[in-house]
């Protein structure tokens, strides 16, 4: 009986030592990954039009987009392509101050700015523009495309939903939904796994 207890104790100690060794190895491997992270800076004037980047977004095709205060950049892993209004293309965007980005299932990139909404056809590069009164406000600070491909637009003066069949926007509180959102500044939008839309606001909570 005594020998049986010794054998059991031996196996318990062996298991404990093995567990501690594996845990230590895992921690060391994790630290090694953390300490060996490599950063590469993309900065103006070589890759970006400005160092003020307001949003980084990866679209469904894998391209990385940078929303900056001086234009929109597309990064393909090797080089950047700049989209901005300038002397040669004065009306390419409603403004070069880009605030947010999202793409839908129809190859459209939705571009929020401080002076309206721009929608780029990624196949042709053509850009369509929307401003108030189509929107509740020209300052677009949040965008979200839900699983049913509905586009939601958060502005400094309420929440809008795009109606593709009519190529127009309806305003939450005026045309549908809770009237308490009508004049609220929307800062962030997220659809969760249950299909609920989370709406982050300025000074009005969630």
Regions found by a protein language model. Name each.
Residues 1-206:
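Carboxylate-rich, polar loop motifs that coordinate divalent cations or form catalytic acidic clusters
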């Amino acid at each position: 009986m005594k020998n049986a207890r010794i054998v059991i104790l031996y196996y318990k100690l062996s298991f404990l030592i093995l567990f501690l060794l594996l845990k230590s190895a895992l921690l060391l491997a994790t630290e090694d990954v953390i300490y060996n992270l490599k950063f590469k800076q993309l900065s103006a004037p070589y890759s970006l039009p400005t160092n003020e980047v307001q949003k980084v977004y990866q679209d469904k095709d894998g391209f990385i987009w940078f929303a900056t205060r001086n234009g929109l950049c597309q990064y393909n892993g090797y080089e950047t392509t700049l989209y901005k209004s300038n002397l040669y293309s004065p009306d390419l965007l409603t403004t070069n101050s880009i605030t947010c980005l999202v793409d839908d299932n129809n190859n459209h990139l939705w571009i929020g700015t401080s002076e309206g909404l721009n929608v780029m056809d990624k196949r042709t590069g053509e850009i369509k523009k929307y401003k108030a009164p189509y929107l509740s406000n020209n300052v677009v600070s949040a965008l979200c495309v839900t699983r049913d491909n509905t586009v939601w637009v958060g502005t400094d003066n309420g929440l809008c939903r795009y109606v593709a069949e009519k190529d127009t926007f309806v305003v939450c509180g005026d045309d549908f939904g809770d009237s308490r959102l009508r004049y609220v500044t929307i800062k962030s939008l997220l659809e969760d796994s249950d299909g609920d839309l989370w709406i982050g606001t300025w000074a009005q909570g969630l």
